[in-house]
Amino acid sequence: RTHRLVWIWELNNGGRVEGDMQEFENDAFWGQFSNHVESWGTAKAGRIMSWQEGDVKEFPWGHIWDISPKDPVAFKKAHDKIVKSASDVFKNRVVGFGTYDINRPNGASHWVVIGGTGLNGHLNMHQDLEDNYTKAMNDYFINRGEVEHVQDFIVEVLARY
């Protein structure tokens, strides 16, 4: 796979801001779009439990971790606390935590995403957290509880509407 499409919307409010398309417009859109798709991957669905909006022009790369926390409530509390405690590091970055409720990738129940400037930018962010937020990071790892790391990967945001 070379590209992913991600639709994000408020639960029970998935319509378009401009209003719904007519059926023929929707059919035309997907017909044209499908001409550019060689094969479709699997679809997944879940909920956003925590979200900080960011500038995807400044930080166009997202590092995504697929995880299974033993205690999702404790994980969310620890996640929200580290984002607040290290707000200088996370400023203008998309930072999110959510669930996989349908079609969990490799059994992962949750995901985390952090925006960055590419591979080197993400590594520098981790170094900054370790060097300058040691206590906050230690608290995060203690308070989040046991977490199974399933996989992680980086994606580039090419367009956002």
What residue spans do the PLM features occupy?
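Short S/T/G/P-rich N-terminal loop/turn motif that feeds into the first structured element of a domain
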Residues: R1-Y161
